[in-house]
């Protein structure tokens, strides 16, 4: 139960603090993967936390190639898949959260502006 709450807060923190540059490492591959796109960095970090390192590496590679070779559509579909995974995980874990916490927690949606569309970030605000 406590692990679920910690994981939700970790995922929300990773999304919100994606920053301007993201660096992810993989145990199989020692190379560092970097990107300067904020929403791509956030989704890549969440995917990496969710043990989808292959999707994470592919997303970062596509982000680097998007401006040059026109992979923007494939990149946006990978970003959307990452958000869907995160939403499903939050819904799955949310039913195990204790009722007193549910009363103090608020689900807040804020638009996150990107080049093409708004991406809604869901994070949890509590009294802790």
Swiss-Prot record:
Residues 1-22 form the signal peptide. It is found in: Secreted; Host cell membrane; Host nucleus. It comes from the Eukaryota. A motif (RxLR-dEER) lies at residues 58-75. Induction: Expression is up-regulated during the early plant infection stages. Keywords: Host cell membrane, Host membrane, Host nucleus, Membrane, Secreted, Signal, Virulence. One of its GO terms (cellular component) is host cell nucleus. Belongs to the RxLR effector family. The RxLR-dEER motif acts to carry the protein into the host cell cytoplasm through binding to cell surface phosphatidylinositol-3-phosphate. Secreted effector that suppresses pattern-triggered immunity (PTI) in plant host. This is Secreted RxLR effector protein RXLR-C09. It comes from Plasmopara halstedii (Downy mildew of sunflower). The gene is RXLR-C09.
């Amino acid at each position: 139960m406590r692990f679920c709450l910690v994981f939700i807060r970790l995922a929300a923190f990773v999304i919100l603090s994606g920053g301007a540059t993201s660096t992810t490492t993989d145990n199989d591959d020692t190379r560092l993967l970097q990107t300067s796109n904020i929403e791509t960095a956030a989704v890549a970090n969440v995917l990496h936390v969710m043990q989808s390192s292959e999707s994470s590496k592919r997303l970062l590679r596509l982000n680097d190639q998007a401006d040059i070779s026109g992979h923007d559509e494939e990149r946006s579909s990978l970003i959307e898949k990452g958000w869907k995974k995160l939403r499903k995980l939050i819904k799955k874990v949310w039913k195990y959260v204790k009722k007193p916490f549910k009363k103090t927690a608020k689900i807040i949606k804020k638009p996150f502006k990107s080049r093409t569309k708004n991406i809604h970030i869901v994070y949890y605000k509590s009294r802790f």
